[in-house]
């Protein structure tokens, strides 16, 4: 049967519908077409196949068939082998509310033990709940770079213990802190070896004294006496190394694995604070000093509290560090200066449970950095799986806040202390391992609590226990009677082992060919007693009445038969559930195409074979989530900022924030240039304030929203300024009016005066006596006077 597309079932009914798709719905019955000859082979065909061991089964009826078909053929119900997969809870202590009191009795994961019984190609669902309990004990180990460049930082943290205890005791009543220091391997070329005095005082040429160089030293075991932290820090002095990178990874490894020296408690959150202003050496760098022995991940801190293997063992690799940090349930905090923050950000993407903070040049902000990092760690729950058998595959669905089910996710963010989240897990088995019982562990990163899953691979039939060797039912002892059929011994054939290979007759050849003229046993077997005995092959199994089928002639895709997602039957691929295509290379699942905003391919493409094909111009990324030129690039992220940062907006009102917004929110004072893939966005909120943020996705695929802490809001009016302004305006207006009035009067007077002057200039008066004027004297002439 050629592989063909099958409709994708709902995740809750994958088992039933997926099985039916291969056993008779719209196609041949796979149980009867695989040519199986034993109960064990029948169970491996499909989860829907059953085997009948009833001796009274009518002749010609298949023993491997659907259960309902076997019952129709009058197979006794007690003779039907049909194991059913199941999940049983073995241990289920209730989740705790608080971590105070006896911390060994605190439970943050439920259930604690589960037993799975799975038959081949079957799956089973189970769930796990996780709660971040309140007032949980905390261990903080402060690991400091004591190279010369950190001299001012050492002075800044002399009172850190008291301040840290004051802040952290707002979150937990059970705090312990410790201290350790590192520089680098005390061997050339990492240290100064000449002149001789440089060995005792590496700062000889700087007119000062510092400690001889050391790799790592443990200073203070975890203690609740915070004043001792201050005292021990004040006793420390810096040293000096020759090259720029430090030996911090050596220190991290020893602080992680030396449980007894450090004092890590089993029932506490473990924080390892790593502070430096420089790069760090990694695995294989030790070869510069001729150190070729790989790091063994063991504790080598001696009675003097110094790392004794510093000069004989290479630096640890990131993989080894990740393994040990996970085993010890330690959350690593990189507190590094801005010049190296990008490097340690890349490291954190490879180490689960790690956070990065920017350390000021004098470490003055380390207190707030630790508190913020602890809050970030406690706001996230992420599951990790250990020792998963290769025959098993797991798929996750997360139920975070507000009972929102998010398919394909095994982490929840934005949590508060006391919140409870759950995860639905589907375990599916392929094949039958030699070891029938195995176990694996599921645990939240950084938690001591875990879920242990015990798996039993149900590949055998119960009737095999009643097998009769050399049974009289098999032609007087020529075979073993097992599960209703004879398993013939060497040299015997037939349904009852009645035919010997030595009894050869030429007429039997015709019974070994499907049609006249066709090759006997398809040229891949011998005809004995009228039955084909198929040849063995190094490539796989040859089966069928005429040896016409095999399980190795199917097409290969990327070097794997049927892409590793199906079984080869008679040259055709029979695809597993959730897979289709001629090569079984196309998944029908769409959760891999689900973007962080809850839309298929971010609404910019279509999902084909489990991958997004971006349609909208300018969009790219695994889920078409990146599209700087798209008009909605900032629009949707704006809603996430409003919801997750400011607890408002449409998504907040609809309680769908965690479903659609899986971004990590980080508050910053100002936006920085994080590369060409970063998208800067700006919008006005309901208060008419301008909010600026940056959308960035790092190399691991984690989406981060950097939001400026304080929105730029228009300032309200200053009453005093307004009052003075009004009064000033009134005075100015009055003064201006007076000035204008005075100006107008002056202009008018000048005009009148000019007119007067003009008229006076035009006036021309004749000389004459005033007719009204009378002189003071009057002269009269006496006409009678004649004079003498």
Curated annotation (Swiss-Prot):
Organs and tissues of expression: Isoform beta-3A and isoform beta-3C are widely expressed. Isoform beta-3A is specifically expressed in osteoblast cells; isoform beta-3C is specifically expressed in prostate and testis.
Annotated spans, Involved in CX3CL1-, NRG1-, FGF1- and IGF1-binding: 203-210
Family statement: Belongs to the integrin beta chain family.
Effect of residue 119 to W: In GT2; uncertain significance
Transmembrane segments: 719-741
Outcome (variant: residue 785 to A): No effect on cell surface location but impairs interaction with TNS3 and PEAK1
Subcellular location: Cell membrane; Cell projection, Lamellipodium membrane; Cell junction, Focal adhesion; Postsynaptic cell membrane
Effect of residue 773 to A: No effect on cell surface location but impairs interaction with TNS3 and PEAK1
Post-translational modification as stated in the protein's UniProt record: Phosphorylated on tyrosine residues in response to thrombin-induced platelet aggregation. Probably involved in outside-in signaling. A peptide (AA 740-762) is capable of binding GRB2 only when both Tyr-773 and Tyr-785 are phosphorylated. Phosphorylation of Thr-779 inhibits SHC binding.
General function of this protein: Integrin alpha-V/beta-3 (ITGAV:ITGB3) is a receptor for cytotactin, fibronectin, laminin, matrix metalloproteinase-2, osteopontin, osteomodulin, prothrombin, thrombospondin, vitronectin and von Willebrand factor. Integrin alpha-IIb/beta-3 (ITGA2B:ITGB3) is a receptor for fibronectin, fibrinogen, plasminogen, prothrombin, thrombospondin and vitronectin. Integrins alpha-IIb/beta-3 and alpha-V/beta-3 recognize the sequence R-G-D in a wide array of ligands. Integrin alpha-IIb/beta-3 recognizes the sequence H-H-L-G-G-G-A-K-Q-A-G-D-V in fibrinogen gamma chain. (Microbial infection) Integrin ITGAV:ITGB3 acts as a receptor for Herpes virus 8/HHV-8.
Binding site for Ca(2+) 1: 149, 152-153, 277, 361
One annotated GO molecular function: virus receptor activity
Matching Pfam families: EGF_2, EGF_integrin, I-EGF_1, Integrin_b_cyt, Integrin_B_tail, Integrin_beta, PSI_integrin
One cellular component term from this protein's GO annotations in UniProt: melanosome
Effect on the protein of changing residue 166 to I: Probable risk factor for neonatal thrombocytopenia; alloantigen Duv(a+); does not affect significantly the integrin function
In-chain residues carrying the UniProt-annotated modification Phosphotyrosine: 773, 785
Signal peptide: 1-26
Protein name as catalogued: Integrin beta-3
């Amino acid at each position: 049967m050629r592989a063909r597309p099958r409709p994708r079932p709902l995740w809750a009914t994958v088992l039933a519908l997926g099985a039916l798709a291969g056993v008779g719905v719209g196609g041949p019955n796979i149980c009867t077409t695989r040519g199986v000859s034993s109960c064990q082979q029948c169970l491996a065909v499909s989860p829907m196949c059953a085997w009948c061991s009833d001796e009274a089964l009518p002749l010609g009826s298949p023993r491997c068939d659907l259960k309902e078909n076997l019952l129709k053929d009058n197979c006794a119900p007690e003779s039907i082998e049909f194991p059913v997969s199941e999940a049983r809870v073995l241990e289920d202590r209730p989740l705790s509310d608080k971590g105070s009191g006896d911390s060994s009795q605190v439970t943050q994961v439920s259930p604690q033990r589960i037993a799975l019984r799975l038959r081949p190609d079957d799956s089973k669902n189970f769930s796990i709940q996780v709660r971040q309990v309140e007032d949980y004990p905390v261990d903080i180990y402060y690991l400091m770079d004591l190279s010369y460049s950190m001299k001012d930082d050492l002075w800044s943290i002399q009172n850190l213990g008291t301040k840290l205890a004051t802040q952290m005791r707002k979150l937990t009543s059970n705090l312990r802190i410790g201290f350790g220091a590192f520089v680098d391997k005390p061997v050339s070329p990492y240290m100064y070896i000449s002149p001789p005095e440089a060995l005792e005082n590496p700062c000889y040429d700087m007119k000062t004294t510092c400690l001889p160089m050391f790799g790592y030293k443990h200073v203070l075991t975890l203690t609740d006496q915070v004043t001792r932290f201050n005292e021990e820090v004040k006793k420390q002095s810096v040293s000096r190394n020759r090259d720029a990178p430090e030996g911090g990874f050596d220190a991290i490894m020893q602080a992680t694995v030396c449980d007894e020296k450090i004092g890590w408690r089993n029932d506490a959150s473990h924080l390892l604070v790593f502070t430096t202003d420089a790069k760090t050496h990694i695995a294989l760098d030790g070869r510069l000093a001729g150190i070729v022995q790989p790091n063994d991940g063991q504790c080598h801190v001696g009675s003097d509290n110094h790392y004794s293997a510093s000069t004989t063992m290479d630096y640890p690799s990131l993989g080894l560090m990740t393994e040990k940090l996970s085993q010890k349930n330690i959350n690593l905090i990189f507190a590094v200066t801005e010049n190296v923050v990008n490097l340690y950000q890349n490291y954190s993407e490879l180490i689960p449970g790690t956070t990065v903070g920017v350390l000021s040049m004098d470490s003055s902000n380390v207190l707030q950095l630790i508190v913020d990092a602890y809050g970030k760690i406690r706001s996230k729950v992420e599951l990790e799986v250990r020792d998963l058998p290769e025959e098993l595959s797991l798929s996750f669905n997360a139920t975070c806040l507000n009972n929102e089910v998010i398919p394909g996710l095994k982490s929840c963010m934005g949590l508060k202390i006391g919140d409870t989240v759950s995860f639905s897990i589907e375990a599916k088995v392929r094949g039958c391992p030699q070891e029938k019982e195995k176990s694996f562990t599921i645990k939240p990163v950084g938690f001591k609590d875990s879920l242990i899953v015990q798996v039993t691979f149900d590949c055998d039939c119960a009737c095999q226990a009643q097998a009769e060797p050399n049974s009289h039912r098999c032609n007087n002892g020529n075979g073993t009677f097992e599960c209703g059929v004879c398993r013939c011994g060497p040299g015997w054939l037939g349904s009852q082992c009645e035919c010997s290979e030595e009894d050869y007759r030429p007429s039997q050849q015709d019974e070994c060919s499907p049609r006249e003229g066709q090759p006997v046993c398809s040229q891949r077997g011998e005809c004995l007693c009228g039955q084909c005995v198929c040849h063995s092959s190094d490539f796989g199994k040859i089966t069928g009445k005429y040896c016409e089928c095999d399980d190795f002639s199917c097409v290969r895709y990327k070097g794997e038969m049927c892409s590793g997602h199906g079984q080869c039957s008679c040259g055709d691929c029979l695809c597993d559930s959730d897979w289709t295509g001629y090569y079984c290379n196309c998944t029908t699942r769409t959760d891999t195409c689900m973007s962080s905003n809850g839309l298929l391919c971010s609404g910019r493409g279509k999902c084909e074979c489990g991958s997004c094909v971006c349609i909208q111009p300018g969009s790219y990324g695994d889920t078409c989530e990146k599209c700087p030129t798209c008009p909605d690039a900032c629009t949707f992220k704006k809603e996430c900022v409003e919801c997750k940062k400011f607890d408002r907006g449409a998504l907040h009102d609809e309680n769908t924030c965690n479903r659609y917004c899986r971004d990590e929110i980080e508050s910053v004072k100002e936006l920085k240039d994080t590369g060409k893939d970063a998208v800067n966005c700006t919008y006005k909120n309901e208060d008419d304030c301008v909010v600026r943020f940056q959308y960035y996705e790092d190399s691991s695929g984690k989406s981060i929203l950097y939001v400026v802490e304080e929105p730029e809001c228009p300032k309200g009016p200053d009453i005093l300024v307004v009052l003075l302004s009004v009064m000033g305006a009134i005075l100015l207006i009055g003064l201006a009016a007076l000035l204008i009035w005075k100006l107008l009067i002056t202009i008018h007077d000048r005009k009148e005066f000019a007119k007067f002057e003009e008229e006076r200039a035009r006036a021309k008066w004749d000389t004459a006596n005033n007719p009204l004027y009378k002189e003071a004297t009057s002269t009269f002439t006496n006409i009678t006077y004649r004079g003498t």
